[in-house]
Amino acid sequence: YAVGQASNTEIDEWGITYALGVAALRALSQVERELGLRLGGESTIKKASGESAGKIVEGRPGGSVGESIGNCEGSVRALPKVAGILDGPSDYITKALNTFDAPDVPIPADITTKVKGDQHCATVATAAVIAKVTRDRLMVDLAQSNPRYAAYEWAHNKGYGSAAHRTAIAEHGPTPLHRVSWHLT
């Protein structure tokens, strides 16, 4: 798995929806790289014997390429289908595809949206937990990395606008890591 991120500056500049799309594409691109999912490239996925699973080619169900792949005994494999489920009503990933800021994603995902997806799909719920744990660890690490950040209590509030956090912003101003578009002061 991968957790994509957008910086506070990117979110302020682009808006949250577009920044979420770019962050998701960064994660998808990282997963594809780690799995070796690149058209025409040698797969980094290995067979049990340790040898390469073969070249990656584009295969379509019912097409001649797909049929010939089945006859190659693993020397060439069909390009996997990548799918994604987003928790909520908006597909912010597809909107960010092929934009200037988005990373190269040669296998675009077919995106499905599901309101309250974390309540209906274990994969969505798991992804939500992984994202939140990653964010919480990042906030604790940031809080411990610089004594200047202690007043904001990120290790405890994880960046949410608690009373103590808002008081610290009012007294000390936002840090370079704060999203100024939220106007918390």
Protein language model features and the residues they cover:
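RNase H-like, Mg2+-dependent phosphodiesterase core
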Residues: 1-40, 44-58, 67-185
